[in-house]
């Protein structure tokens, strides 16, 4: 017991020295977490030996020491990866490398220089909440640390990694808890941003200049902007929409980057008739065998995770699949899950197998194989 007490005293003495030093060096904070880890190992062992006190020190239950030890291991190993990155020489405070800060939204990221954002629900100053907008956020993507800036808009607080936008505070979700009218205003940096009556999560329609089919378009910003992806609500739409007047536009799903414009109703109706005939003929041929359908992989998971994963697929593995849909959801379903879906299509089953053999699908995303009984291409 005396040996255990000496080791514990030495460990706690080193912790006190680190606290007093209040260093800005990352190596010192790594040393701090090593000491915390060692301290909890000693306390865990003391409890196993049946000790309730070591001198004046109360020995906590096994579960407490085990949990704190695991936290210390996690922080030590994570900070060691930061030290090896280009940000290892930056000044870091003890608070910025604390476990509490590690779990502060956005979770499992390091944050610096927080600023307060006030959100007034129902546009009432007495019904307001305060959130922290971080000037710098350190995100680990594919085992590589990236330093990005925190940003705010009417929808929430977010950061961008490449072209992938991640919201860590969603004002619409918060409004469902704190607001009666689902309206709010954001007060930040001497500016006030008012919300619409309802915030739509879909991408705005594409605006067309002129009646021709290849006019210049202006695209609204999407949560994850990938040039070959369709808008969020277009996946389950039929090949053409029936329009009610001239100079309207319909999207053509066969190629998501193209726009089809109809200058009169007759032109579009005739195209619909031809397309429907081809669709029925294709269905009759495909019903004979599943293998004649288009091979697909259907990904299911959190909407934002799917968008980020889809962005990486286009960036690194676009040769291993043919098309990727936007994120979509089943409607009129008794299933209350909020998981989104992304559908990938392939030239043949061999390309799909090559994709599965090469690409590591995250554990948070479920995938199923299948065939489409209608022609998308």
From Swiss-Prot:
Subcellular localization, as worded in the UniProt entry: Host nucleus
Region (Disordered): 270-297
DNA-binding domain as annotated region, ranges: 293-377
Ranges annotated as biased composition (Low complexity): 272-292
GO cellular component, one term: host cell nucleus
Recorded GO MF terms: DNA binding; DNA-binding transcription factor activity; nucleotide binding
UniProt keyword annotation of Membrane present: no
A single BP term in Gene Ontology: regulation of DNA replication
Role according to the record: Plays a role in the initiation of viral DNA replication. A dimer of E2 interacts with a dimer of E1 in order to improve specificity of E1 DNA binding activity. Once the complex recognizes and binds DNA at specific sites, the E2 dimer is removed from DNA. E2 also regulates viral transcription through binding to the E2RE response element (5'-ACCNNNNNNGGT-3') present in multiple copies in the regulatory regions of the viral genome. Activates or represses transcription depending on E2RE's position with regards to proximal promoter elements including the TATA-box.
Subunit: Binds DNA as homodimer. Interacts with protein E1; this interaction greatly increases E1 DNA-binding activity. Interacts with protein L1; this interaction enhances E2-dependent replication and transcription activation. Interacts with protein L2; this interaction inhibits E2 transcriptional activity but not DNA replication function E2. Interacts with protein E7; this interaction inhibits E7 oncogenic activity. Interacts with host TAF1; this interaction modulates E2-dependent transcriptional regulation. Interacts with host BRD4; this interaction mediates E2 transcriptional activation function.
Name of the featured protein: Regulatory protein E2
Species this protein is from: Pygmy chimpanzee papillomavirus type 1 (PCPV-1)
Organism taxonomic ancestry: Viruses, Monodnaviria, Shotokuvirae, Cossaviricota, Papovaviricetes
């Amino acid at each position: 017991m005396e040996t255990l007490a000496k080791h514990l005293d030495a460990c706690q003495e080193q912790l006190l020295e680190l606290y007093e030093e209040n260093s800005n060096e990352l190596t010192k904070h790594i040393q701090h977490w090593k000491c915390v880890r060692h301290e909890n190992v000693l306390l865990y062992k003391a409890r196993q030996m049946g000790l309730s006190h070591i001198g004046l020190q109360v020995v906590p239950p096994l579960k407490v020491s085990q949990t704190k030890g695991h936290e210390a291991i996690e922080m030590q190993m994570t900070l060691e990866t930061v030290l090896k990155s280009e940000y290892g020489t930056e000044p870091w405070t003890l608070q910025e490398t604390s476990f509490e800060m590690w779990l502060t939204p956005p979770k499992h990221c390091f944050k610096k220089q927080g600023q307060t954002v006030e959100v007034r629900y129902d546009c009432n100053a007495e019904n307001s909440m305060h959130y922290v907008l971080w000037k710098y956020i350190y995100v680990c993507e594919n085992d590589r640390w990236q330093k990005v800036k925190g940003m705010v808009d009417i929808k929430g607080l977010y950061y961008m990694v490449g072209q992938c936008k991640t919201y860590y505070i969603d004002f619409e979700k918060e409004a469902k808890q704190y607001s009666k009218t689902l309206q709010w205003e954001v007060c930040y940096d001497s500016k006030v941003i008012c919300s619409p009556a309802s915030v739509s999560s879909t991408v705005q329609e594409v605006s067309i200049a002129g009646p021709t089919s290849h006019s210049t378009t202006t695209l609204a910003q999407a949560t994850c902007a990938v040039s070959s992806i369709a808008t969020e609500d277009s996946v389950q739409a039929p090949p053409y929409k029936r329009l009610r007047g001239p100079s309207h536009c319909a999207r053509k799903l066969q190629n998501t980057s193209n726009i089809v414009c109809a200058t009169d109703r007759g032109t579009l109706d005739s195209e619909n008739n031809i397309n429907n005939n081809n669709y029925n003929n294709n269905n009759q041929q495909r019903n004979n065998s599943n293998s004649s359908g288009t091979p697909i992989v259907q990904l299911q998971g959190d909407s934002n995770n799917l968008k980020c994963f889809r962005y990486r697929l286009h960036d690194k593995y676009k040769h291993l699949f043919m098309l990727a849909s936007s994120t979509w959801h089943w409607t009129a379903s008794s299933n209350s899950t909020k998981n989104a879906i992304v559908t990938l299509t392939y030239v043949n089953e061999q390309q799909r197998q090559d994709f599965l053999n090469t690409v590591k699908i995250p554990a948070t995303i479920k995938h199923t194989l299948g065939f489409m009984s209608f022609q998308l291409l």
